[in-house]
Amino acid sequence: GAPSKFIVADMPFMSYHVSVEDSLRNAGRIMKETGVNAVKLEGGREFCAVVKALTAASIPVMGHLGLTPQSVHKLGGYSVQGREEDKRKRLVEDALMLQDAGAFSITLEKVPASLAKEISEKLTIPTIGIGAGNGCDGQVLVINDLLGLDSGFHPKFVKKYADLYSVSKEALETYNREVKDRSFPSKDYSYE
């Protein structure tokens, strides 16, 4: 575990979509079985009743607005959310509604920096940005992206702080070569 860290678990797809009762049961199970400190769910006003029920049951809830990966196909792909005025307005309203429902924080993903800043200034709870500019109260990146653990596509907002993919690939190739030529394990790594 990580006793000095605050850990938030994503509620899996469809674990909070069917009913408030199912959502309570599923969130409670996640909290008990994983030992996390809070749960996060994607979506706005349509899930405010769930947020209210969970927080009433002492389950801390983080909201998630903008690009919501669990419903990416409904959104038309991995595009920036909230560029059009009506969608921008709806995201602001959804953020305020989630706050009023009891969310302790909201993740804003892949929205214009100006929108994230506007939402952050209107809320009294912290915002965490991922592809939302520097106007949020905090930032998050996927650890595999941050560490450069793969060589594939990376969204514009991802900054690779290391290239562990290349380091790992080189280490595995060296290991493979040494096993094949029998230079590993040498005496230093063997028992007599």
Where are the language model's segments positioned?
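Alpha/beta enzyme core
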Residues: G1-A162, S166-E192
